[in-house]
Amino acid sequence: MAIVLIDPESQIAMDAVTGAVAEWSEDVVTLDVMPLYEKVEELEQYVNDMMRAMDPSTTTWGTLPGREGVHETAGFLTNFAHGFVIGTMIVALVAFTLAAVYKLHALRLLGL
Protein backbone atom coordinates (compact mmCIF):
# COMPACT_ATOMS: atom_id res chain seq x y z
CA MET A 1 0.00 0.00 0.00
CA ALA A 2 1.69 3.20 -1.16
CA ILE A 3 1.23 6.27 1.02
CA VAL A 4 2.63 9.65 0.04
CA LEU A 5 3.24 12.21 2.79
CA ILE A 6 1.90 15.55 1.60
CA ASP A 7 2.84 17.58 4.67
CA PRO A 8 4.94 15.83 7.34
CA GLU A 9 4.42 18.62 9.89
CA SER A 10 0.62 18.44 9.90
CA GLN A 11 0.75 14.70 9.11
CA ILE A 12 -1.40 14.74 5.99
CA ALA A 13 -0.95 11.79 3.66
CA MET A 14 -2.42 10.59 0.41
CA ASP A 15 -3.12 7.01 -0.60
CA ALA A 16 -1.47 6.56 -4.00
CA VAL A 17 -3.91 3.86 -5.12
CA THR A 18 -7.24 5.48 -4.26
CA GLY A 19 -6.19 9.13 -4.12
CA ALA A 20 -7.77 9.63 -0.70
CA VAL A 21 -6.24 12.37 1.44
CA ALA A 22 -6.42 11.97 5.22
CA GLU A 23 -4.63 12.62 8.45
CA TRP A 24 -1.78 10.23 9.03
CA SER A 25 -0.61 8.80 12.32
CA GLU A 26 1.98 6.16 13.17
CA ASP A 27 -0.22 4.45 15.74
CA VAL A 28 -2.93 3.67 13.16
CA VAL A 29 -2.70 0.26 11.53
CA THR A 30 -3.40 0.19 7.81
CA LEU A 31 -4.36 -2.85 5.81
CA ASP A 32 -3.54 -3.41 2.18
CA VAL A 33 -6.76 -4.63 0.58
CA MET A 34 -5.46 -4.84 -3.00
CA PRO A 35 -4.78 -8.61 -2.79
CA LEU A 36 -8.33 -8.99 -1.52
CA TYR A 37 -9.66 -7.00 -4.49
CA GLU A 38 -7.68 -9.24 -6.85
CA LYS A 39 -9.22 -12.36 -5.30
CA VAL A 40 -12.71 -10.84 -5.55
CA GLU A 41 -12.12 -10.03 -9.23
CA GLU A 42 -10.99 -13.62 -9.82
CA LEU A 43 -14.13 -14.92 -8.09
CA GLU A 44 -16.23 -12.59 -10.24
CA GLN A 45 -14.65 -14.13 -13.34
CA TYR A 46 -15.61 -17.59 -12.09
CA VAL A 47 -19.17 -16.46 -11.36
CA ASN A 48 -19.47 -14.85 -14.80
CA ASP A 49 -18.13 -18.07 -16.33
CA MET A 50 -20.77 -20.09 -14.50
CA MET A 51 -23.47 -17.72 -15.73
CA ARG A 52 -22.14 -17.95 -19.31
CA ALA A 53 -22.25 -21.75 -19.01
CA MET A 54 -26.04 -21.50 -18.98
CA ASP A 55 -25.98 -20.11 -22.54
CA PRO A 56 -25.14 -22.91 -24.99
CA SER A 57 -23.95 -20.53 -27.70
CA THR A 58 -21.02 -19.19 -25.63
CA THR A 59 -17.80 -20.79 -24.46
CA THR A 60 -16.35 -21.10 -21.00
CA TRP A 61 -13.52 -18.95 -19.66
CA GLY A 62 -10.51 -21.21 -20.26
CA THR A 63 -11.39 -22.80 -23.60
CA LEU A 64 -9.53 -22.39 -26.85
CA PRO A 65 -10.82 -19.88 -29.42
CA GLY A 66 -13.17 -21.04 -32.15
CA ARG A 67 -15.28 -23.31 -29.95
CA GLU A 68 -18.42 -21.19 -29.96
CA GLY A 69 -21.58 -23.28 -30.19
CA VAL A 70 -19.89 -26.51 -29.12
CA HIS A 71 -22.45 -26.97 -26.33
CA GLU A 72 -25.32 -26.72 -28.82
CA THR A 73 -23.75 -29.40 -31.01
CA ALA A 74 -23.02 -31.67 -28.04
CA GLY A 75 -26.56 -31.24 -26.75
CA PHE A 76 -28.04 -32.06 -30.15
CA LEU A 77 -25.90 -35.17 -30.57
CA THR A 78 -26.66 -36.37 -27.04
CA ASN A 79 -30.40 -35.91 -27.50
CA PHE A 80 -30.23 -37.58 -30.92
CA ALA A 81 -28.40 -40.61 -29.48
CA HIS A 82 -30.83 -40.92 -26.57
CA GLY A 83 -33.80 -40.64 -28.91
CA PHE A 84 -32.32 -43.24 -31.25
CA VAL A 85 -31.70 -45.73 -28.43
CA ILE A 86 -35.12 -45.23 -26.85
CA GLY A 87 -36.83 -45.40 -30.26
CA THR A 88 -34.98 -48.62 -31.13
CA MET A 89 -36.02 -50.15 -27.81
CA ILE A 90 -39.68 -49.25 -28.42
CA VAL A 91 -39.61 -50.64 -31.97
CA ALA A 92 -37.96 -53.85 -30.72
CA LEU A 93 -40.56 -54.20 -27.97
CA VAL A 94 -43.40 -53.74 -30.47
CA ALA A 95 -41.79 -56.20 -32.92
CA PHE A 96 -41.28 -58.87 -30.26
CA THR A 97 -44.83 -58.37 -28.99
CA LEU A 98 -46.26 -58.71 -32.50
CA ALA A 99 -44.10 -61.77 -33.18
CA ALA A 100 -45.33 -63.39 -29.97
CA VAL A 101 -48.96 -62.59 -30.81
CA TYR A 102 -48.64 -63.98 -34.36
CA LYS A 103 -46.84 -67.06 -33.06
CA LEU A 104 -49.65 -67.73 -30.57
CA HIS A 105 -52.20 -67.17 -33.32
CA ALA A 106 -50.36 -69.59 -35.63
CA LEU A 107 -50.16 -72.21 -32.88
CA ARG A 108 -53.91 -71.89 -32.28
CA LEU A 109 -54.60 -72.35 -35.98
CA LEU A 110 -52.49 -75.48 -36.04
CA GLY A 111 -54.26 -76.79 -32.98
CA LEU A 112 -51.19 -76.99 -30.81
Swiss-Prot record:
GO terms for biological process: methanogenesis, from carbon dioxide; methylation; one-carbon metabolic process. One of its GO terms (molecular function) is tetrahydromethanopterin S-methyltransferase activity. Its main location: membrane. It is a single-pass membrane protein. The chain crosses the membrane at residues 80-100. Belongs to the MtrB family. One of its GO terms (cellular component) is plasma membrane. It catalyses: 5-methyl-5,6,7,8-tetrahydromethanopterin + coenzyme M + 2 Na(+)(in) = 5,6,7,8-tetrahydromethanopterin + methyl-coenzyme M + 2 Na(+)(out). Part of a complex that catalyzes the formation of methyl-coenzyme M and tetrahydromethanopterin from coenzyme M and methyl-tetrahydromethanopterin. This is an energy-conserving, sodium-ion translocating step. InterPro entries: MtrB_MeTrfase (IPR008690). The lineage of its organism: Archaea, Methanobacteriati, Methanobacteriota, Methanomada group, Methanopyri. Keywords: Cell membrane, Membrane, Methanogenesis, Methyltransferase, One-carbon metabolism, Transferase, Translocase, Transmembrane, Transmembrane helix. Pfam families: MtrB (PF05440). The complex is composed of 8 subunits; MtrA, MtrB, MtrC, MtrD, MtrE, MtrF, MtrG and MtrH. This is Tetrahydromethanopterin S-methyltransferase subunit B. Pathway: One-carbon metabolism; methanogenesis from CO(2); methyl-coenzyme M from 5,10-methylene-5,6,7,8-tetrahydromethanopterin: step 2/2. Its EC number is 7.2.1.4. It is found in: Cell membrane.
